[in-house]
Structures are given as C-alpha cells and as structure tokens.
Amino acid sequence: MTSSYSSSSCPLGCTMAPGARNVSVSPIDIGCQPGAEANIAPMCLLANVAHANRVRVGSTPLGRPSLCLPPTCHTACPLPGTCHIPGNIGICGAYGENTLNGHEKETMQFLNDRLANYLEKVRQLEQENAELEATLLERSKCHESTVCPDYQSYFHTIEELQQKILCSKAENARLIVQIDNAKLAADDFRIKLESERSLRQLVEADKCGTQKLLDDATLAKADLEAQQESLKEEQLSLKSNHEQEVKILRSQLGEKLRIELDIEPTIDLNRVLGEMRAQYEAMLETNRQDVEQWFQAQSEGISLQDMSCSEELQCCQSEILELRCTVNALEVERQAQHTLKDCLQNSLCEAEDRFGTELAQMQSLISNVEEQLSEIRADLERQNQEYQVLLDVKTRLENEIATYRNLLESEDCKLPCNPCSTSPSCVTAPCAPRPSCGPCTTCGPTCGASTTGSRF
C-alpha cells in the first residue's frame, strides 16, 4: 500500500498571489486483491486566500470573498507533512463569518466524501476478504474431499489382510511343525521297518536252516525207511535162510538123531532158534520204536518250528503291509503339505508384492497431499500477510482520519475572532505570531511547489 502527501501547484484557472496557500492531498493507493480498484481518484484540497482569486476545495469552486480583508496578524502554519487547510482559516481578521462557514462546510464535505470513499473501500475489501475466505474454505473442503479421501476402509482392509497374513503364518508354522512331526514319525517307521526287515531276514534264515533240517530229516527218514526195508528184506532172507537151514538141519538131525540118540541126548535147536528169533525180534522192535520216536520227535519239532516261523512270517508280512500303507499315506500327505506350503508361499509373496505396491501408492499419495498441504499453508500465510498489510493500511487510514478530525477540531478552536466586529481584546492585545509547526518554514508562492512524500 502506498500513501503519499505532496503539495502541488494550483490547477488551471487559479493564480497564486502573495499570501496564498495551497492544501492538497495526494492519491492514496490501496493495494488489494486482484480485481479490486488499485487507486482512489486524487482529491485536492486547495484554499487560496487572495483578494482577487477563486478558491477551490477539491474540484468545487468557491466564490470570491465579498469583504475587503485586512492583512493577517499571524503567519500561516502548515501542518506536518502537507500544506493543509487554507492559511487564513482560524486567523484573526482573515474572513468574515459567512466565508469561514463556507470553507468549513466545504472542508467537512470533502473529508466526509473521502471518509465515505474510504469506508466504501473498507467495506468492499471486507466483502472481498469474506469472498476469498469462502472461496478458500470451499477449496479446502474440495481438497479435503478430492485429495484427502477416507482411508478408513483401506485401513480396515489392511488390518483384515494383516490378520489373514498372521493366521496364514500361524497355519504355516503349524503345518511346518506337523511336517516335522511327520518326518520324525516317518524316520521312526523307517527305523522300525529296517529292524523288522532285519528280523525278517533272520526269520528267513532260520526258516532256511529249518528247511534244511527238514530236508535232512526227510532224507534221514528216507534212509531209515530204506534201512527198514532192507532190514525187512534181510529179515525175510534170514527167515528163508533159517527155514532152509532148519530144514537142512532137520534133515541132517534126523539122520544124526538116531545116532546121537544112540550115543547121547541132543540140544533142543528149536528152543535155541526161538530164543534167538525172540531176541532178534525184540532188538528189531526196540530199534524200530526208537527210530520212530526220534523221527516223530524230530518231525514234531520241525513242524512246530515251521508253524511258529510261518506265524511270525505272516505277522511280519502283515506289519510290513501296514507299514507300507502308512508310508504311502505319509508320503501322499507330505506331498500334499509340500504343495500347500508352496501355494501359501506363493500367495504370501503375491500379497506382499501387492501390499508393497499399494503402500508405495499410498505413500506417494500422502506425499502429494503433504505437498498440497504445504502449498495451502503457504497460501494461507501469504493471505495472512496480505490481511495483516490491509489491517496495517486500515489502521494507518484510521490514524489519518483521526489526524484530520483533530486538525479540524483544532482549527475550529482557533476561530474566536470576527474581522468585521473588532473586539477590545484584539485591539488591545493583537494576536502574536505562531511558530512554524511543520516542515514548511515559509508560506508563499513557493509553498505550492514543495513536495513531501512518504510510503508505508
């Protein structure tokens, strides 16, 4: 905002005379928002106190004074910063009462017009400020609705997916534990299978040994049967031979009996042969019974061993089948668990990639929102600074209005004398000259050419 005070020369149609004074107010520029008026039209307050000149206040002409005014008894005092208000207003013997009232009215009208323009400008600036605040509020709401969407649903989805991931991790850990347990059980079953296999090999070796014993016993039985047959044949041959010998002996003894009877008594050969036959038959029966008992004992032992071995073999075979079924089931379950583990790992990797991409997008969106927020903050700070500048302008203008009001009140207080009616006090004690109170030290024709400016 720029405000400058300067004293300018009279406009066309106004000539300066000795003792004339100019009061001019330069344009007051108020910097505002784009689209607002940048400048207020310049207004000049000109008052020329001369006998033959016209006086203008702003652009309003005042008529010539109708009275012949004597020279003033005071030196005109310009106000600080400008050559304000006509120099002879409020000075003893300057004008008549009607002329002073006309100047006061014109000055008040000018100041009222300027105050009205200022108030209109302030109202316009306040209205524009309210419009800008409403626009900023709408833009902030629009940014909040478009740039800052509601992420609560995404947060709920992320929490649900995190819970699912945790559940999947727990399930994966449980499956890993089950797989480890299954591996340990499979190792135990493998060890048991190896032990059963070694036991089976031992049983098969025992079976082979028992089979060999059985074969040997069968061979021994066959040998014994062959020996029995040979003994039977030998017995038959011995019987036949014995009968033949008996016949021969009987035939021989028949002839010798007579001789022996004649000589001495003979031995009973039938009894001896019967005893020998009985002894041989007892020996054969004993040997046969012993061989049969040994054979039966061996056969029973071998059959018992064979039965026990067959039962153990069946038990081992059934256990082997059960173990094979268990191993196959565990292998199938292990393959299924491996497949499930691979699927879960793939789904976990996909979920991590997807959520990583979404997280990157959200981070980029958050960074964009932060940038927009920083821009909005910068705009708010800039507008706040502009608002502070406008408040400063308003304060300075209010101070200026107060200064004008004080000047008017002070000028009103300085008008006690009437040039047409001479009071005794003015005759006896004329007004003393006043000291200079402003930057201007002389008031004459050169006062209209001096210029003083200030910017704030």
From Swiss-Prot:
UniProt-listed PROSITE patterns: IF_ROD_1, IF_ROD_2
Positions of the UniProt region annotated as Coil 2: 268-411
GO function terms (MF aspect): structural molecule activity
Entry annotated with the keyword Coiled coil: yes
Keywords: Coiled coil, Intermediate filament, Keratin
Keyword Protein biosynthesis: no
Region ranges (Tail): 412-456
GO cellular component, one term: cytoskeleton
Residue numbers spanned by region Linker 1: 140-150
Family: Belongs to the intermediate filament family.
PANTHER family xref list: INTERMEDIATE FILAMENT (PTHR23239), KERATIN, TYPE I CUTICULAR HA8 (PTHR23239:SF387)
UniProt-recorded name of the protein: Keratin, type I cuticular Ha8
Organism: Homo sapiens
Gene: KRT38
